[in-house]
Amino acid sequence: MTKQALDATIADMAGPFLASLGLELWGIELSYGGRTVVRLFVDGPEGVTIDQCAEVSRHVGLALEVEDVISSAYVLEVSSPGLERPFFRAEQMSPYVGRQIELTLIDPTPEWPGRRKFRGELLAVEGDTVVLRPEGAPAPEAEEAVLRTSWQGVRKANLIHVFPEPGHKPRR
């Protein structure tokens, strides 16, 4: 089964149960190595509790076993996406425009030769295109200071949590 097919199967199995708890599936990570690890990231309007993660783990784990979705031994991990949440779809980034993110591309772009990893301010999400002002870029108003990339060209994207200066209120 391909990663996309496995992701879709797990999402279909977990979705209704998560909805009944007022949660949503933020994303799925699969890692293969010495052992297979299936990571489910779940979130809700008020976040997610440890008890909810445990309940989701029991329910989804049982469903995966009954349906024999993964034929080899695996470990199921369920957690919140956290402060430095990974992004699994471009539209997940929209609420974080203006915040700092880290972006790793599959291949370098012609505008930024030899460079695949970027940190900087998320300027916009336009459909499937992510617009970022990388750290160390030329003058902010210059067009070459902006990285525009299709989500299909992104290997990994994470929010960077910036802790507030002592005595200042955190950004929301």
Curated annotation (Swiss-Prot):
Annotated GO biological process: ribosomal small subunit assembly; translation
Alphabetized InterPro entries for the sequence: Ribosome_maturation_RimP (IPR003728), RimP_C (IPR028998), RimP_C_sf (IPR036847), RimP_N (IPR028989), RimP_N_sf (IPR035956)
Top-level division of the source organism's lineage: Bacteria
Disulfide bonding pattern of the chain: none
UniProt keyword list: Cytoplasm, Ribosome biogenesis
Subcellular location: Cytoplasm
Pfam family of the protein (one): RimP_N
GO cellular component, one term: cytosol
Function: Required for maturation of 30S ribosomal subunits.
Family: Belongs to the RimP family.
PANTHER family in alphabetical order: RIBOSOME MATURATION FACTOR RIMP
The protein, known as: Ribosome maturation factor RimP
Organism of this sequence: Nitratidesulfovibrio vulgaris (strain ATCC 29579 / DSM 644 / CCUG 34227 / NCIMB 8303 / VKM B-1760 / Hildenborough)
